[in-house]
Amino acid sequence: VSVPAAPGGQQEVRHMAAVSEQQSRQLAEVSRQTEWEKPSFGKELFLGRFRLDLIYPHPVPTDADSERGEAFLAKLEAFLTEQVDPAEIERDAKIPERVIKGLADLGCLGMNISEDYGGAGLSHLYYGRALALTGSWHSAIATLLSAHQSIGVPEPLRWFGSEEQKRKYLPPLASNKISAFLLTEPDVGSDPARMHATAVPVENGAAYELSGVKLWTTNGVIADLLVVMADVPRSEGHRGGISAFIVDAHAPGVTVLHRNKFMGIRGIENGVTRFDKVRVPREDMIGDEGRGLKIALQTLNTGRLSLPATCAASAKWCLKAAREWAAERVQWGQPIGRHEAVAKKLAFIAGTAFALEAVMELSSLMADEERNDIRIEAALAKLYASEMAWKVADELVQIRGGRGFETAESLEARGERGVGAEQVLRDLRISRIFEGSSEIMRLFIAREAVDQHLSVAGDLIAPNVELPDKAKAAGRAAGFYGKWLPRLAVGAGHLPSSFAEFGPLAPHLRYVERTSRKLARNTFYGMARWQGGLERRQAFLGRIVDIGAELWAMSAACVRAKMLGTDEAGDLAVLFCGQAARRVDQSFRDLWHNDDASEYAAAQQVLAGRYEFIEAGVLDPSGDLPLIASSDAAAGEEIRPG
């Protein structure tokens, strides 16, 4: 399994960079974090081993983390409710400078920066709770703070920066300097092998000359410091490759060409940035040449946890809005929440909101503990939270009917409470695209999920491996599968007494245990059936990952309910697990009984233009500009000239 590969092997026709499919896959593979030095609940789950001991007892924050975090949240809540008008941000599509300054004065720019470097030193848990709080007030504020800290300069510096870099940059970043992360280009999204931006060594290697255009630079319009990914050409003394640089956003040659506008998150400072021979000192490279993509991917292992936090917050807000409206609105003689059609939606929102918070809190606490490798758990959390929160918001809009489609401003203008259901729907939509689209996330997780299989049997299915190496792989595979496969037949999930301490939740944990083994068996069947072609069965792999995500959420919901110890929490966990199990069972059916092949064939006919007759009778107001602007011809007004 590699990321990504198109079914059928058709190579993209339009190339702005002469990069083969194989080269793209190789770059993605060498940029992976290959070591598994700590246990992983997610990895074990996909292998059919339900390691409840890795998440139960549910981890808890330290007293110091709680004291520091609760005090910070209290100040943040007071600031938001007293000093920030979310309607102003939504109306003007901009966070006022006074608000940004107030956030900086409060310490919000350094929430997850260590106190050693002037930050607030919040744990992952309380950093997530702070983002949830700000995101529930207005999404643009949470986006500003998370883009600055979760993927901006502070996070890669935390893991890969030198001590000198940390002492130089982290204090101002924790105080009043805003950062941004720049990877995407007009023709480069999930395939960084096509990157055009270059950093050419100059001055005998003492500096680099950075040139290129970066797109969708969240915070880039107002940022002071940037972490930029650029390709260093291979030359004598330079290994080359995609590398990470800290760049002064005000340096000569840095130009913000355009401030982008989106369907949601109004107020986001996202733009297009051009670099024209910008000098970057060698000491401002993070890590070594060629390590940039690896740094970016490993940074996201924990950086991705910001999105589950804001998605969980949105789901919780949707529950409040749905509950209040379903109790207030009366149709056919009773509140609409008493009609089964609406009651089912309320139940879905309630169960999902509980599960999303459980996933977010457990993932964050596991990151704080540093006892487990959470790359799979964090990726599953991001994928699951973004998909489910969107469905929750859609159901809220449906429950509120016409008022769900009406803006908060319009509702207030005619004397009703400004419940911005349509706003949360618009704001959440990008979560399925931000920091790895759901489709790419499924492929990334699938690659990690089958890592054990590839390590023991990869040479058996690889096309260019010599026979002696295949023979060795066959021996390894026989030894591994001879022990592994029999263990997938029976387990604790078949014993009625298993997990008895969980009471009413025990049947659901037994289901997770049984189903994890079933998931592992089906993954193996897919590998046996398609072998090297499995990487092209993206729909199959996507369903495998979706099943794993549901099992992860069920596990988190159960251990959280057990920790909380209330009947209410137990009720919601049972509710959610029942809903999730039905989705899982359907996904298993779809693994082997589907229309994947016929749908793929039809899509190729669509691409070939065979069905263009369907497009007749409509007008296209989009104009005739290119669908993708070339990197050397990026247009737009100059927001901040270089």
Region annotations inferred by a language model:
Residues S175-L183:
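A short, Trp-centered hydrophobic/proline-enriched beta-strand micro-motif
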Residues K168, P186-V200, L215:
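Beta-sandwich/jelly-roll carbohydrate-recognition scaffolds of carbohydrate-active enzymes
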Residues D187-S190, W216-N219, E236, F262-E269:
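Short Gly/Pro-enriched turn/cap motifs at secondary-structure boundaries
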Residues R194, V254-F262:
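Sequence-specific dsDNA recognition surfaces
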Residues V3-H148, L157-R158, E163-E164, P171, ...:
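Flavin-dependent oxidoreductase catalytic core characteristic
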Residues A206-A207, S211-V256:
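A short core secondary-structure module
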Residues S146-V153, T184-D187:
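Short, glycine/charge-rich beta-strand/loop segments that flank catalytic centers
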